[in-house]
Amino acid sequence: MTPRPAVSAHRGGSERAGPATWEAYEDAIASGAEYVEFDIRRTGDGVLVVYHDPRVGPAGPPLARVTHAELCDRAGYAVPVVDDVMALIAGKLVAHLDLKEIGYEREVIDRAVALLGADGLVVTTLEDCSVAAVTRGFPEVRTALSLGRDRRELALARLPGTRLSELFPARRIRACGAHGVAVHQRLARTNVLREATRRGLFTMVWTVNDDSLMRSFLTHPRVDVLVTDRPRRAVALRGPITRPRH
């Protein structure tokens, strides 16, 4: 029987609430997803928050220069605190922690393990050094190296080398000690999934919202977790999990 991957609600999902809001994370619990993803950054007053972008708006100040209260005011909603979201989902969903910055790995994972247990989370990040910090400090916690960095974050001269290292990431994975890969859907259509499973790594594919692509990845034998903004739809398309993946 074909195994079916788990579903991760990206930013809590956005089918019934704004993404990365408290309401989205409450809704994720009822969505049928097994995982829920949240991005982690730190504000200027040291609060670890669930927020994707490095700035408050396209031309706004960096998060590192505003307090949590200022961030909420500028964003126009109560930006969730990481500890609160972890407490909300504890025992209900696996936390998919996407680390957006370096330097706070131990603090975040200490809290996560205390609230969720080591088997209640998976850590993803684009930064090899963050993966290495987590795998060294918390070998019992699953980590996945994210592949598919936004080209807008890269100088033109770095783009070819970065893409090559994502298409053939074995050296990076060995160096940082990742247990898996979190692959952008475009890269997932290359050889990356095949190589990952050949090496015994678990795999996540992000962020898949189109019905036809979801169907394709939900029946893909090399996909362990599908990350989507539409967790209810993904669960409906998938049907029940037929065999535990990891």
State the predicted function of each range.
Residues M1-H246:
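Phosphate-group recognition and catalysis centered on beta-loop-alpha active-site segments
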